[in-house]
Every structure is written in structure tokens, then in C-alpha cells.
């Protein structure tokens, strides 16, 4: 039996209706098979740069920048022997021959997509097994393939896994995961939020609605892990996931379509308020001179509508600029304006607005520091909104036309080449909506 009475209509990224009257819980990370698969996939997927390993050994440049060890060069044809190396690594990584291990070569053997078997995570406290097991397997496979001596084996390890464990992170490694190392988490339950915006944008090939969807899935699934989306707050987070990230009732799409040509942040707010009135989400509580004060009997639904409006405003504003840099200002002033327009709480009850103040400063004010694409939901500046800010940043970076120093191409090239090959990472909206439609009668 469903916990909540809410039902939504689900659409694709072109605004076409896919399924009507889907129970809200069909989009829950606890129920939706596609979301479960995406989360598990992100935990167990590793990108391996075989060409990078070969070049690191050939030049003896290992362990990060300014680290070249003269006389330790190894000229190994790793790319040319990629098939043999990958097969040997797979044999070490897998638990049984018929498990869900996947080792797939890409780009003519220059890259490898590795998916560590689920059985390894059944006996793991967290997700470090993916990079560490993968790295160890490829190190051994390369050593065995080329009969590397015991005196040169440490160079192979350094070329694959970098300076670790002398460094906390895998500095200079030629492997990559979307999840950062556990030591960098701001607190318990933050792992799925600790994924750079640019990684999400790269994996979805800069498709704006898909990037927003994947970011929302990660952020809102983290709320279940952190204990935020429990009890009285579960419905609020599910509605946010549905409307802001999954384009429920085509709300985001409709707002962008209506405002895309000549609209502004303000016109998106005006349309959003009108839509909320039509749908009975809000009502006029008090009429003053030239001003209306609105009220609602359903704050969670109002928050979802406001969050969808914020996503649309970001797409309209940053899309018009073809630049992501102003996303922090959109996050700030959309919420400031909607509070004044309605008298109702802004998105995430003020937490997005508060986040945007610091985000503006640290992304391009006096301090600078880094562009929007290098932030994540675990970052000390942007962690404060519980799942409603970072998806908008992902949408903004997807719309950026190359204005950023820290672009997805610059920071996330290996992620793009490898993770975008996984259909559910590249088109999460499609697969989550289809899965919700399949299980709707089971809720």
C-alpha cells in the first residue's frame, strides 16, 4: 500500500508524455529499480586510462605533477596488449564466472570500463573496493603480461594508482571514479553528494535535463542515506525529486518552453505562481493594496513547485547567457524574488538562498577559487541545501558553451569517455521514468 496519495504524470526529455498517474513512491530510491541500478553502478564502476598508464611508464612521470623519476622509464606496449591485460584483470576482479563483473575496452584499447562485482560490496563497509580492487588487478595483469621485474613493479603500481598511500587521494592515478574518496566526506551519508558537477555533466554528454535528473537522483538518494528523507520529510524529498529532477507533470519543460525565447527569472516566477494557483497548490490568503499574500495547505508540494521553477529559471537564464557563471545569482535572486512575490518560503525553506550567497562569493567574487562545475553537494560552500541546489548547477554547466576554465572537458574527460558508455548514466531520466511506469501497479 502506498504511503502517499500523490500521483504524477511522467515525461521524457522532449516533453512527450510517457506514463500518466504514476504513484510518487514509484520514483523513490527505495523502490525504483533504475535508481537502484544507477546508484549501485556508480559505486562499482571505474574508468581505467590504459594509454595514460603506458605514457606514465614511458616517461617515468608518476605520482602527480612535478614528479619524474629519471632512469625508471619502462617502454611497455600496454594499449597494444590491452585485450590480454583486460582479460587477466577481469579474472582477478570477478568472484564467479557468471557474476556481474564487466571489463570492457574502449577507444581501441586506450580506455577500459570496469564494473566490480556486487559480491565484493556485500562484504564491504563502503565503496573503496571498486578503485582499489581494479587498480590492484590491472597492476598485476601488466606485471604478468610483460614479466616486469620485482625492482620495477613499484613503477607499475605508481602509474596505475598514483602516489597513494603517501597521499590521501590517488594522486596522479590513471583510474577514475565518480565517487570521491571517503576521507573527503563532510559527514556521514555524504558519499553520493561528493560527485563533482562536471562529472555528472560529462556522463550525460551535456544534455541539460539528463544532467539535472542524474544530479537530482544522487542528491535526493543521499537524503535517504543521511536520514533526512524519513518520516515527516520523506514526501518533501520525493516531491522535489519528481518535480525538480524528473520533470513531473512536465512542469520544468513547460516553464522553459514558455520563457525560453524572451523570458527572465522574473517571468518564470510569474508563470510558476500562476501554475501553482491553477493547480490548487497555493491560494490568495490576503489582498493588500496592489499586493497579494499567498498561503498553502501543502508546503511540501509548494516546495516542489518552487524547486521546479528554480530549475526552469536556471535553464532560461544560463541558457540565454550560454554561460554557467551566473548560476549562483539565479539561485539567490530567484528565491529572494519568490519570497517577496508570494510571502511563502523559498526553495528548501531558505537553504538554497543561503547556499547561493556563499556560492556566489566562492565561485566568482573577491575570492574566486573555482567555477561552478567543480562544486558538489559535499562541498562546504554548497552542502547546506538538502538536494535542491546542485541539480541546478548541473543544468547550468550542461548549458555552458565553453566559457569556463574548469569545464567538463578539462576536469572530467576520462569520466565522459567511459561513464557515458553506460546507458543509465547517460540517460537517467529515460530509464527511471520507464522503471516507474513498470512498477506503478505494485505501489
Curated annotation (Swiss-Prot):
Q: Which reaction does it catalyse?
A: coenzyme B + methyl-coenzyme M = methane + coenzyme M-coenzyme B heterodisulfide
Pfam families per the record?
MCR_beta, MCR_beta_N
Q: Which GO terms describe its molecular function?
A: coenzyme-B sulfoethylthiotransferase activity
Q: Which GO terms describe its biological process?
A: methanogenesis
- The EC number(s) attached to this protein equal 2.8.4.1
Keyword set includes Cytoplasm: yes
- Identify the SUPFAM superfamilies for this entry: Methyl-coenzyme M reductase alpha and beta chain C-terminal domain, Methyl-coenzyme M reductase subunits
UniProt KW keywords: Cytoplasm, Methanogenesis, Transferase
Subcellular localization: Cytoplasm
Q: How is the cofactor bound?
A: Binds 2 coenzyme F430 non-covalently per MCR complex. Coenzyme F430 is a yellow nickel porphinoid. Methyl-coenzyme-M reductase is activated when the enzyme-bound coenzyme F430 is reduced to the Ni(I) oxidation state.
Q: Where does coenzyme M bind?
A: 367
Co-factor(s)? coenzyme F430
Positions of transmembrane segments:
none
Q: How does it assemble?
A: MCR is a hexamer of two alpha, two beta, and two gamma chains, forming a dimer of heterotrimers.
Print the miscellaneous field. Answer: The MCR reaction has been shown to follow an ordered bi-bi ternary complex mechanism, in which methyl-SCoM must enter the MCR active site prior to CoB for a productive catalysis.
Which family does the record assign?
A: Belongs to the methyl-coenzyme M reductase beta subunit family.
What the protein does comes down to: Component of the methyl-coenzyme M reductase (MCR) I that catalyzes the reductive cleavage of methyl-coenzyme M (CoM-S-CH3 or 2-(methylthio)ethanesulfonate) using coenzyme B (CoB or 7-mercaptoheptanoylthreonine phosphate) as reductant which results in the production of methane and the mixed heterodisulfide of CoB and CoM (CoM-S-S-CoB). This is the final step in methanogenesis. Neither N-6-mercaptohexanoylthreonine phosphate (H-S-HxoTP) nor N-8-mercaptooctanoylthreonine phosphate (H-SOcoTP) nor any other thiol compound such as CoA or CoM can substitute for CoB as the electron donor.
Q: What is this protein called?
A: Methyl-coenzyme M reductase I subunit beta
Species classification: Archaea, Methanobacteriati, Methanobacteriota, Methanomada group, Methanobacteria
Q: Which gene encodes it?
A: mcrB
Amino acid at each position: 500500500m502506498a504511503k502517499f496519495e500523490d500521483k504524477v504524470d511522467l515525461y521524457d526529455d522532449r516533453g512527450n508524455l510517457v506514463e500518466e498517474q504514476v504513484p510518487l513512491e514509484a520514483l523513490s530510491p527505495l523502490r525504483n529499480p533504475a535508481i537502484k541500478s544507477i546508484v549501485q553502478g556508480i559505486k562499482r564502476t571505474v574508468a581505467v586510462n590504459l594509454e595514460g598508464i603506458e605514457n606514465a611508464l614511458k616517461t617515468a612521470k608518476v605520482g602527480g605533477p612535478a614528479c619524474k623519476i629519471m632512469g625508471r622509464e619502462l617502454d611497455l606496449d600496454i594499449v597494444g596488449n590491452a585485450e590480454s591485460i583486460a582479460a587477466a584483470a577481469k579474472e582477478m576482479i570477478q568472484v564467479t564466472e557468471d557474476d556481474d563483473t564487466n571489463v570492457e575496452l574502449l577507444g581501441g584499447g586506450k580506455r577500459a570500463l570496469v564494473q566490480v562485482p556486487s559480491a565484493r560490496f556485500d562484504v564491504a563497509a563502503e565503496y573503496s573496493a571498486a578503485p582499489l580492487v581494479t587498480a590492484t588487478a590491472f597492476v598485476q595483469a601488466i606485471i604478468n603480461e610483460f614479466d616486469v621485474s620485482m625492482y620495477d613493479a613499484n613503477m607499475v603500481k605508481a602509474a596505475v594508482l598514483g602516489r597513494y598511500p603517501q597521499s590521501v587521494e590517488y594522486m596522479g592515478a590513471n583510474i577514475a571514479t565518480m565517487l570521491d574518496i571517503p576521507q573527503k566526506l563532510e559527514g556521514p551519508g555524504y558519499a553520493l553528494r561528493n560527485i563533482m558537477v562536471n562529472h555528472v555533466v560529462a556522463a550525460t554528454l551535456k544534455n541539460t535535463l539528463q544532467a539535472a535528473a542524474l544530479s537530482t537522483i544522487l542528491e535526493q538518494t543521499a537524503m535517504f542515506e543521511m536520514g533526512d528523507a524519513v518520516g515527516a520529510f520523506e514526501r518533501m524529498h520525493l516531491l522535489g525529486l519528481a518535480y525538480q529532477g524528473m520533470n513531473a507533470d512536465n512542469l520544468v519543460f513547460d516553464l522553459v518552453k514558455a520563457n525560453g525565447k524572451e523570458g527572465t527569472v522574473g517571468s518564470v516566477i510569474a508563470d510558476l505562481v500562476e501554475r501553482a494557483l491553477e493547480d490548487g497548490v497555493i491560494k490568495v490568503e490576503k489582498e493588500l493594496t496592489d499586493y497579494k499574500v499567498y498561503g498553502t495547505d501543502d508546503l511540501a508540494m509548494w516546495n516542489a513547485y518552487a524547486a521546479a521553477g528554480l530549475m526552469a529559471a536556471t535553464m532560461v537564464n544560463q541558457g540565454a547567457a550560454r554561460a554557467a557563471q551566473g548560476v549562483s545569482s539565479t539561485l539567490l535572486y530567484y528565491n529572494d524574488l519568490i519570497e517577496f512575490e508570494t510571502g511563502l518560503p523559498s526553495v528548501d525553506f531558505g537553504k538554497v538562498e543561503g547556499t547561493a550567497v556563499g556560492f556566489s562569493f566562492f565561485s566568482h567574487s573577491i575570492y574566486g577559487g573555482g567555477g561552478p562545475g567543480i562544486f558538489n553537494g559535499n562541498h562546504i560552500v554548497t552542502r547546506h541545501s538538502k538536494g535542491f541546489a546542485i541539480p541546478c548547477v548541473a543544468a547550468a554547466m550542461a548549458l555552458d558553451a565553453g566559457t569556463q576554465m574548469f569545464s567538463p572537458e578539462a576536469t572530467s574527460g576520462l569520466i565522459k569517455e567511459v561513464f557515458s558508455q553506460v546507458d543509465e548514466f547517460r540517460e537517467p531520466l529515460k530509464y527511471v521514468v520507464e522503471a516507474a511506469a513498470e512498477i506503478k501497479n505494485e505501489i
